[in-house]
């Protein structure tokens, strides 16, 4: 089977991270995509494991070169998905899992039409 991206979205607090973590523990044919950010690492976070920690200049250059699959600026920091992170996993035969918001999911789906999309609905929005 040819690998394909798996996009997981939900409202905040619906449990998408918990569900994805459970899948990752059970299935070695999938892996979470390591995203990039310009914020400083928090205690215990490692570059290339939790995030790719980039400078603002590095991130803006990646945007200009079309290397970002999707990105957003939140307050004073950039967050996004380097296209290379997705493509590198698929070259290894691994399905990349992207845990992103609905708008990001649309952007990714437009670039990877074969991507599977999963929307997790909580039992209640209350």
What label would you give each PLM region?
Residues 17:
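Walker A/P-loop
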Residues 37-98, 102-106:
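ATP-dependent small-molecule kinase phosphotransfer cores
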Residues 24-34:
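Post-Walker A helix-loop "phosphate-sensing" segment adjacent to the P-loop in P-loop NTPases
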Residues 14:
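ATP-binding Walker
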Residues 9-11:
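P-loop (Walker A) phosphate-binding loop of NTP-binding proteins
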Residues 1-6:
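Pre-Walker A (Motif I) flank of P-loop NTPase domains
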